[in-house]
Amino acid sequence: MLISRQERARICSDSELGAGNLLARLKAYGRPLDEPVLRTDGTWRAPDGSRPEVLTLGELYAVVEAYAGWYAAHGVRPRDPVALHSSSSAEFAVNFLALTSLGAIPSFVNGNLAPETAREYVRRQGAVGAFTDESHREVLTDAGLGFHVTADAIRPEHRASLPASYPYRHDPTDPVLISHSSGTTGMPKGVPHTHRTLMYAQVHRLRYSTGTDMERTLVGLPGAHNAMVATLLYCLLLRTDIKLLSSQRGADVLDTVEEFRPTTVLAFAGTFGEMAAEDLTRRDLSSVQVWFNTGDAAHEAHIRALVAHGSHQKVDRDLRRVRVDGSVFVDGLGSSEAGYSVFHNRHTKDTDAYARRIGKPISFAEAAVLSEDGIPLPPGQIGRLGLKSPTLTPGYWNDSLTWNRMRLGGYWLTGDLAHQDEDGNFYHLDRAPDAVRTRAGIVFSTRTEELLLAELPELADCTVVGVAPDGVRADWDGDGEGEAYALLQVTDEGAADAADAAGGDEAWTERVNSVLTAAGYPPVHRALRMKPDDVAKGATGKVLKRVMRDRFAAEEQHA
């Protein structure tokens, strides 16, 4: 049951509400304690020793207070960072609610980070202690932290240790979370968000959207990402039936869709790409009305595969709501720093706004395509994408140097290359480090991948990387030249083997370049087949093109 109009008005006018005090405000609103509010996937152990799959609001209060009591008894105070290193989305959610209720700052560490990276990242945060799951216990054992706890140490009786001032009263500028960037360019950057920045978009959505398509919401986002927390906050306010999934594997998300029957599914583009590569005709996706992507913009081929399933409501010519076949895919471009997907591009099976179009910025944000000296460029010219938004992080945790280097002309630079059309729509071309300067022109890797996936139905996915000689920089910021390679994953092994027999990599290269040439894009040097397991991915599922470049260059050198 979603909130009433009266509840919505009360929430939107609540000047005390923020990301750090949501549970306290729900109590003030008089929400019933026996109402189910959160579903988990069984990966989290509760203080009573059970592994509940559903928590009521009253049970969530009790759990959060037990965790908060344990932390308070072990010296955690307001503004203390506490590291959380786990693979369980529910553990991140519960710890976020508990630590913020004390005024402390949960510092999320993705469970997929390499151990040495996780240790160094936590050291840079200045964390006073850590919570881990059992599988990550050893990673931070010798990290010199004040305490190190797992779920089995926290008991219901720890509620008695809550401080007299509980819950903490936040200022809008108080930090309530440190999550981290994907780490695709090296060490992940600590990205804090405040009581205000993490809640701003959620209240905006409540003002302007009924949210009826989110009545049953499946969250396939990484638990360690602030997008999961933002979704949790919104769903708790909206009173949706929300389930947190710890796995971002496409097959696991599809299994859960069939079991949970959600109306909305949230995930990153990599997860949606894996889902689209499955035989979806063998899946029951009829419950889905909306797929919501955030992070990197998704590829057309993957979107089209998903919107063919499910259904959604639209308003007909007589202004009546009617249900039609096919779901909606909301393609959001965002980042940890942006705090919310500033761009939303809505797709159905009957729309065609593709070609890396990401649309226009949401009403509360401002975007521009900038020249190298920070001047907004006219339509058609390629430049750096810059953002201004009340949801933007106030900076990188303990790294103001990097933060200030990513500001230009009053905008925060996303690291993306883009251009606009005459109607003000933005188009995403590539990440600046992933563009490849070649003798034939600049190969924008993401744009090239988009075209190949749309034109070659045999491809399940593809990755374009650049390789340059030692000491030569051939990306957007470089002045040298390299060679671009298209690394292909195919859907039909039989057809692929037949193509190999007819010419192997040379045949694939010819096919790929014929598509690129017809579109007026620079060709690649070679196209090569590869298996999904050969693709290096980061903690959040993004392809690590930096790693792929280095690996491929080494292989070419020894070939």
UniProtKB/Swiss-Prot annotation:
Binding positions for Mg(2+) per the UniProt entry: S181, E337
Organism in which the protein naturally occurs: Streptomyces sp
MF (Gene Ontology): ATP binding; CoA-ligase activity; metal ion binding
Cofactor: Mg(2+)
Descriptive protein name: 3-aminoavenalumate diazotase
Binding sites annotated in the UniProt record for ATP: A227, G332, S336, D416, R437
Enzyme Commission number(s) of this protein: 6.7.1.2
Induction: The avenalumate biosynthetic gene cluster may be dormant under laboratory conditions.
UniProtKB keywords: ATP-binding, Ligase, Magnesium, Metal-binding, Nucleotide-binding
